[in-house]
Every structure is written in structure tokens, then in C-alpha cells.
């Protein structure tokens, strides 16, 4: 998921309160930190260029959080798992990583909006590998959360239900969003 956050001491309580305020996207190449929030906000009827007083890029997910905490922007967007307690930074994602690394106290932020689910980036294998090697790799990844949960948490960067096989169709909506974004910038 993408999550829009503000400082906890902000008067902004919801997306509706964001009208006329500034928004930091994380990175132009990020699905959760730019592409999906921008698309879903537009789908909700918001004109990004006029609804917000200004938008910009924070220079990355962590940097956008810091920019909001330093009052350079009123709100920012970042990636979160959407699972677990928001007050702890969820189970995975940028906020959780910042909390775990001592860079963020979630009591300093408030989540005001979350996107629909966003597929995580894929784990892939070369087509040229022998089928047996592909099956071994895929089986190991699919069972990792059961066979070695601590390893799974390191690989997935947090808690979660495990990995599963998907094909290209699973990512088609992200590809389509990116293509629309590129066409709109021409």
C-alpha cells in the first residue's frame, strides 16, 4: 500500500483537509511513493496540480518523511504493508524500517490515507535456467515463511503471510499506470 502521512501535530486529519496544502512524493520511479498515489488520487477526482498548493519529490522514501517532519511539506506518501498496527509503522515498509532503525517515532506522524493494495516487486529467475532449478528456487521462496521465518523476515523486510507465484498479469495494472504516466508527460 501507499500511505499518506502528516505530522501528528498537524490540523490535517484527512485527504479532504489536504486541499491547498503541500505534498511530497517519495520518488518519481516509485510505485508506492508516486505512481499509485497519484493515479488513485486522480481516479478519485482530484486534480493533483490544483488540489495541492504544491507537490515535489522528497528524494526518496525516508527523505520525504524527514521533509514532512521538518515542515518542508505538509504531507508525504510512502510504502507500507497495510498490515499490522499503524502506530508501529505496520509490519513492513518504509515507516517500519525507520522505526526499527531508530529514525522515527510513529507518535510524530499520523496516517490520513492509504491506497489500494500494491503488488510488491517480483522475485524472478532467468527463463534460460533449467526447469528443475526454477522449481527449486520457487519452492524454496514459497515455503520460506514456514521453513525459516527469521530468514523470511529478512528477505521480505518484515512480517507477512509469505510469497506466492504470480505471472505478468499480476502486474499489468502497474504497467498500465506507468504507461499512462509516460504518455501524459509527452
Positions of the model-derived regions?
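Short beta-strand-to-turn element immediately C-terminal to the catalytic PLP-Schiff-base lysine
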Residues: 5-7, 125-126
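An extracytoplasmic/periplasmic, membrane-proximal ligand-sensing/linker region
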Residues: 125-186
Amino acid at each position: 500500500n501507499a500511505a499518506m502521512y502528516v505530522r501528528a501535530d498537524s490540523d490535517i486529519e484527512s485527504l479532504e483537509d489536504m486541499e491547498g496544502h503541500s505534498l511530497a512524493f517519495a520518488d518519481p520511479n516509485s510505485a508506492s511513493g508516486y505512481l499509485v498515489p497519484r493515479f488513485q488520487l486522480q481516479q478519485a477526482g482530484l486534480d493533483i496540480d490544483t488540489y495541492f498548493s504544491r507537490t515535489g519529490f522528497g528524494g526518496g522514501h525516508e527523505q520525504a518523511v524527514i521533509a514532512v517532519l521538518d515542515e518542508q511539506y505538509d504531507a508525504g506518501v510512502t510504502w507500507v504493508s497495510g498490515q499490522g498496527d499503524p502506530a508501529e509503522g505496520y509490519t513492513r515498509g518504509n515507516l517500519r524500517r525507520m522505526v526499527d532503525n531508530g529514525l522515527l517515532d510513529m507518535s510524530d506522524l499520523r496516517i490520513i490515507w492509504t491506497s489500494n493494495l500494491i503488488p510488491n516487486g517480483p522475485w524472478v529467475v532467468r527463463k534460460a535456467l533449467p526447469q528443475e532449478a526454477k522449481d527449486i528456487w520457487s519452492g524454496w521462496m514459497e515455503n520460506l515463511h514456514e521453513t525459516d521465518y527469521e530468514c523470511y523476515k529478512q528477505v521480505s523486510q518484515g512480517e507477512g503471510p509469505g510469497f506466492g507465484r504470480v505471472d505478468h498479469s499480476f502486474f499489468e495494472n502497474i504497467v498500465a499506470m506507468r504507461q499512462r504516466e509516460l504518455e501524459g508527460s509527452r
